[in-house]
Regions:
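A short beta-sheet element
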Residues: 6-69, 74, 78-91
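Amphipathic alpha-helical coiled-coil/heptad-repeat segments
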Residues: 92-122
């Protein structure tokens, strides 16, 4: 069984998969729209999430997740009863692209300090 990813991470399991490598998904619909998740190697992604595609030779998936999280994409959702983010809203966003080695350094440093930040917020 493979995990099924919806708008806010794993929502269940299915006998089939539609991605065959870790994939960055962005919640598209609902209270958690704009949330990001990195899937397991084999997973099913519903239409409640965007599948990101990018050149893995130039972009670290972990760095891209951190960057998208910092953009607070939820704030770009429509203001309806059921929040929705459209591709038209997020596709034009320009992002800085440091060299791959710098992306890895950023991810490593953030991973190092997150336990301290988590302790401060508890």
């Amino acid at each position: 069984m493979y995990p099924v990813y919806g708008g806010n991470g794993i929502t269940g399991y299915h006998s089939k998969y539609n991605v065959d490598r870790p994939t960055l998904v962005i919640g598209r619909v609902g209270f958690y729209c704009g949330s990001t998740h990195i899937t397991e190697e084999f997973a099913w992604i519903t239409d409640n999430a965007f599948i990101t595609t990018f050149n893995e030779d130039n972009i670290s998936i972990e760095w891209l997740k951190l960057l998208l999280d910092s953009l607070e994409l939820r704030n770009r959702s429509s203001s309806t009863a059921q929040p929705v983010i459209s591709g038209k809203t997020i596709y034009p966003i320009l992002i800085p692209l440091p060299p791959l080695a710098e992306q890895y350094r950023i991810v490593s440093q953030i991973a190092e300090i997150m336990p301290f930040i988590d302790n401060l917020t508890q």
